[in-house]
């Protein structure tokens, strides 16, 4: 049994799959001043209960490793590592960039751009390209070779350079389903090897 979850982006997503069958998924949004990632534990608990399962039925965890909000990445990584360690589960980490690259069918090669701040964007073209300068990415976009999938801030920067562009936040999507589909093409790993991909490094206190 596979459990997938993501709190790194616009909502919390969780899903269950048994072999090739997706059993159930759930999407949780912010509630008032409470960020959606705060509901991850209860979301997983309710999802398992609804499907007459317990944590001991899970064999594999799939989690988003970022980039995204610091709070969301931390929630995903903490829950994934604790569950995997306590239940002896295999894990699969998938980047937000790869997830978003599958959110819609594109006419051309998808180029995913997420705001990395400091005049940079996290870029994906078949693989993670890293945080690249906005100006160099503008040159890449202007070749006309790509279908752009972005967040809202990158959409505002690049929409004047391409007609083939969409912000993923404006699309109907279920990232849990996408993660489950992607995971079928990946090898499982040990939880110790899950590495977060932060937009900015987390603060180091005491310096």
Where do the PLM segments sit?
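Oxyanion-binding and handling regions
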Residues: 1-22, 35, 92-207
